[in-house]
Amino acid sequence: MSGAGVAAGTRPPSSPTPGSRRRRQRPSVGVQSLRPQSPQLRQSDPQKRNLDLEKSLQFLQQQHSEMLAKLHEEIEHLKRENKDLRYKLIMNQTSQKKDGPSGNHLSRASAPLGARWVCINGVWVEPGGPSPARLKEGSSRTHRPGGKHGRLAGGSADTVRSPADSLSTSSFQSVKSISNSGKARPQPGSFNKQDSKADVPQKADLEEEPLLHNSKLDKVPGVQGQARKEKAEASNAGAACMGNSQHQGRQMGAAAHPPMILPLPLRKPTTLRQCEVLIRELWNTNLLQTQELQHLKSLLEGSQRPQAVPEEASFPRDQEATHFPKVSTKSLSKKCLLLSPPVAERAILPALKQTPKNNFAERQKRLQAMQKRRLHRSVL
């Protein structure tokens, strides 16, 4: 009974223990189940990040490639437009050259698309607009006291300057459009500096050209009277253009902008007659120079010949005056006489001739002798 009671007494405390053990084991199982899952989550986080980064990189690469393709398309389009503009400029230049200075000023419709402002006499003007000379003269006419005389003077000045202004605008358009086709638009200050630097050599050339042509015409005797008249007219026109440009610079009164003077070929196109005259002048000057050179050569040769003749004549006198005395051979010793025998007793030997045949034969003989010596030594 006691054993049963003990057993019965022992059962109730044992009953709560397994329940408590079970309750304690449940959270432990959950903790155990969570512990192995934590490294899996840690491993999944960098994988997701890598995937996200790869996706973002692919997206950026696609955007970059699309932008590059668009930029290349724009570059090709701009190149085509540039070619078209150059073609139009060339065609406009050819049409302007065909028209010449006889036509009116350049209209805005005929001006090229890439034309820019042009600096003429220190003033920026549109290529198709009125010239600065006309603007200044229009303002000066209102202030002139003499009514009809002033208008006539202004009209004559306009007639003289209109071809020069039209040619200057066309030439500056062609030069600047070609040079600045692939560049940005420069500032007007840089143009002013370049114009002020280029004015000095242009002025010197313009002042020297008429003087040189006049001097050549005076010197050359074979030039015809018509050529002289045409050249004189061209020089007078150049002088008149110079005077008009200086008068314009004084009227402007702007010391910061020096007057700009164009060379004669740009103001007035050369004709075939003028080219022929220049060629004749150059040919005649060449002939004169060759004649002068020949004359100078003859003078130099004539001045050198009389000096050479007395020198040649003086040589025999010196030879006659400088005769060496004969030395007697009696006082000399016999040994010296034996060492220097007379020319007749000397034996003249023939010159040695070395031919390839002789050399080959000598080599063969030497080889045979060497072989005989070796055989003799080997036998002994």
UniProtKB/Swiss-Prot annotation:
Keywords: Coiled coil
Annotated InterPro entries: CCDC74_C (IPR029422), CCDC74A/CCDC74B/CCDC92 (IPR040370), CCDC92/74_N (IPR039496)
Stored Pfam families: CCDC74_C, CCDC92
Sections of the chain in a coiled coil: 47-93
Taxonomic superkingdom: Eukaryota
Comp. bias intervals (Basic residues): 141-151
Start and end residues of each stretch annotated as Disordered: 1-51, 89-108, 128-202
Sequence ranges of Polar residues compositional bias: 34-44, 165-182
Keyword Signal: no
PANTHER family: COILED-COIL DOMAIN-CONTAINING 74A (PTHR14882), COILED-COIL DOMAIN-CONTAINING PROTEIN 74A-RELATED (PTHR14882:SF7)
Name of the molecule in the record: Coiled-coil domain-containing protein 74B
Organism: Homo sapiens (Human)
Gene that encodes the chain: CCDC74B
